[in-house]
Every structure is written in structure tokens, then in C-alpha cells.
């Protein structure tokens, strides 16, 4: 029997810099619809749903024909929300695609899924893209990841890693972590039950919880990235400009 793949888009109404973010309109559609339609294009996914505790988001998703699962309002993070959906599902693999990525490339999500399909012992996977801009590499809002020779995560940080002691590198400054995750269902439920760890709290990066507890995270290197991630009104304006010009980049 093959794997059953569930893709979940966690969406919450509250946002410090952009309240109601999932419902912000880009080119006439709510952002959550852009994400949903792109995830529907991912090869190998059997089911796509939006997980939310907000009735306004739920109504919008139902209006465009998407599946919505109402979840608790008590979750600490998006992964906990995804885990609640997984708990009531018969899926064997679960993808978590953030709801602020209206330009996410289906191929990027497929690369994460491919790691889990290729290695049945791998509990968790994610993705990275090269950083060629020093300013982005130094930006604490851009999460970096370093991996071993097998492509598995050694560490994630908001700090600029690795440190180039001898000067500028000949290639990329580092790799940006993309907020797309794949889990084996049983590990996702275990992960959500683990207590937060010191490094997770220090960096405010929940994936460090897995590393600190000794679990492997496979990291797919991709070139497409996820395009513009929407966190501010300025990001929304840029997204509109991209769609007006020549479609998603």
C-alpha cells in the first residue's frame, strides 16, 4: 500500500504586522486561495486543506471551494495546528505549507515530499535555497540552515551562518530555510507533544526542537524558493506588482 499524503495550510487571523493576513487580497483573490491553488498542483498529494480556528477564514475557504478543518484556538504554533488535523486523518505523510506563500512553487513542495518518499526512516524534511545577497544573509528575519554532506540539517539560525573567516565566499553566502515541512504522521504527533527546548526558545525556531531531541531533518536544495512571503502591507504591494507585470516569479 502506498503513502497517503495530506497537505495542510495553517491559517490564523491574528498577525502583528498584518492582521487578517490570510484574507488579504492579491489580484482579486484572498491570499489563502493563491496558496491553496498552488498546493493543489503538487504531484503526489492526495488531499489539501486549510486548518484554522477563525470562522472568517473558514467561510472564505469554503466559498472558493476549498476544504477547511476547524482547529483549536489554543495552539502555540502552526505545526501544532497541523498535528491536530493529522491526528484525525488516515494520511501517512503530512505536508505543512505556510499560508503566507502565495507564490510557492509546487516543485519546491514536491522536493520536500521526495525526501520522505526516498527514505522511509527519515522523520521530517524541509527545503533550502541559496543566498547570494550578503544583506539577506545577515538579516535575522531570514532563517539560515547548514547541512551535512548527506543533506541533513546541522543547525538553523537567525544569525549569519556559516561565518566566512577568510572573507567573501566564492559561491552563496549560505542557504535560506524555506518554511515548508514534511512529516511522517507518527513523528508529527510525537513532535507536537515534545516540550519546547532551549535553542528553540532562543532562536524562536520550532524546528530546533526536533534537532535538540536528536531527530534527523532532511533538507532539499531547490532553486525556485517560495517567491514573496507576505508579512507586511509593503509585501502585499510587491505581490500585486509581480502579478500585474508578468505573473508569479
Question: Where would I find each of the regions flagged by the language model?
Answer:
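Residues that recognize and position ribonucleotide moieties
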Residues: 16, 24, 102, 181, ...
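Hydrophobic/aromatic residues located in beta-strands of well-ordered beta-sheets
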Residues: 7, 48-50, 94, 125, ...
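Conserved core of the sugar-phosphate nucleotidyltransferase
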Residues: 104-197
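Short, high-confidence coil segments that cap the C-terminus of an alpha-helix
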Residues: 45, 91, 119-122, 215
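Conserved alpha/beta core of the MobA/IspD/sugar-nucleotide pyrophosphorylase nucleotidyltransferase superfamily
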Residues: 170-249
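N-terminal glycine-rich phosphate-binding loop and ensuing alpha1 helix
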Residues: 3-51
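Short phosphate-binding loop-to-helix
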Residues: 49, 55-114
